[in-house]
Amino acid sequence: VKPLPGDSPDMDFQAVANFQQQTSNLLRETSLGRKNLDEAEERLRYIEAALPRTTRVTQAHFQEFERLEKELATLKMRLMGDPILQQKNESVSPSITSRVGGVAYGHWDTRQQPTETQKAQIESAARDYQAYKGDLKSFMDDLEAFQSELQKAGAPWTPGQKLD
């Protein structure tokens, strides 16, 4: 194989491919996290509609619903950033998805070595996402437990509800 003009003779194409694969894997994982948040948001929308029609609903159920809504908003902010500030072109800290997306956008159409900044962005995003995944799993477990509790309290069916 003959290198193209402009390619360095000591170019490590395998290292470039490995970095792009690492970026791709992280992008896929963050997309899955975003999909989980979207599904949780829809489940909470149905739960909100079901709460007033639940036969044995208590104030604690409403408080738990509010807690879950706030936690979902926090998780969305951590993964995707603040959409309000972004719409107003305000300066915001980069979110996990913006760091991964920025690297993917800036590096996937090239055969050049990733920059140190790109490497640092992926390392930072991967580290933050590992911590985030644990929090997301905990939230999803809490949501499932809450749905089960509502089912026992006589709530109408909502998406994601499991058979007991």
Predicted regions and their residues:
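Low-complexity, Pro/Ser/Thr- and charge-rich linker/hinge segments at domain boundaries
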Residues: V1-E29
